[in-house]
């Protein structure tokens, strides 16, 4: 399965800055009924720990345009508490995905927009995103415009 363009467009426009890789995993499980093939421990450009999820041809972080660096061995020890916390969250989400979505307002809103927004509107938002990025316009401005 390829990365879903509608979902990426919504994540990068109307929901920019609101979602995490855990949220993306939950959305993929809810919308596409797919579980991740692999879990990757990573850090972002600021050195903050983040869990990433690998699917067939993409990672959850790609929906958010995040560049994450995988960590191994001793680096994992440094982030042990964050790893435990995020793995526990992932397990809770996987245990009852429907309940998790129901109790998370931004994910409920995302799914509603994903299901109800027309392809034309999402395509228009994606086009705005491409133009804005080419001109160097900030994501926050794009989010407000969509």
Curated annotation (Swiss-Prot):
**Expression induction or repression:** Expressed in the late phase of the viral replicative cycle.
State what this protein does: Contributes to the formation of crescents and immature virions (IV).
Q: Carries keyword Ligase?
A: no
List the subcellular locations. Membrane
Matching InterPro entries: Poxvirus_H7 (IPR006872)
Per its record, how is this protein called by name?
Late protein H7 homolog
The way this protein sits in the membrane is described as: Single-pass membrane protein
The alphabetical list of record keywords is: Late protein, Membrane, Transmembrane, Transmembrane helix
Which ranges does the record mark as transmembrane?
10-32
Q: What is the lineage of its organism?
A: Viruses, Varidnaviria, Bamfordvirae, Nucleocytoviricota, Pokkesviricetes
Q: Which family does it belong to?
A: Belongs to the chordopoxvirinae H7 family.
| A Gene Ontology term for the protein's cellular component | membrane
Q: Does the keyword Transmembrane helix apply?
A: yes
Q: Name one Pfam family in it.
A: Pox_H7
């Amino acid at each position: 399965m390829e990365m879903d363009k509608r979902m990426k467009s919504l994540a990068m426009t109307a929901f920019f800055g609101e979602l995490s890789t855990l949220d993306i995993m939950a959305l993929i499980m809810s919308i596409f009924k797919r579980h991740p093939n692999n879990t990757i421990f990573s850090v972002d450009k600021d050195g903050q720990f983040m869990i990433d999820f690998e699917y067939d041809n993409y990672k959850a972080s790609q929906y958010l345009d995040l560049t994450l660096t995988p960590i191994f061995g001793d680096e994992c020890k440094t982030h042990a508490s964050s790893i435990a916390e995020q793995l526990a969250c992932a397990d809770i989400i996987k245990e009852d995905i429907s309940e998790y979505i129901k109790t998370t307002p931004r994910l409920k809103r995302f799914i509603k927009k994903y299901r109800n927004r027309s392809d034309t509107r999402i395509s228009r938002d994606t086009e705005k995103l491409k133009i804005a990025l080419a001109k160097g316009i900030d994501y926050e401005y794009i989010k407000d415009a969509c």
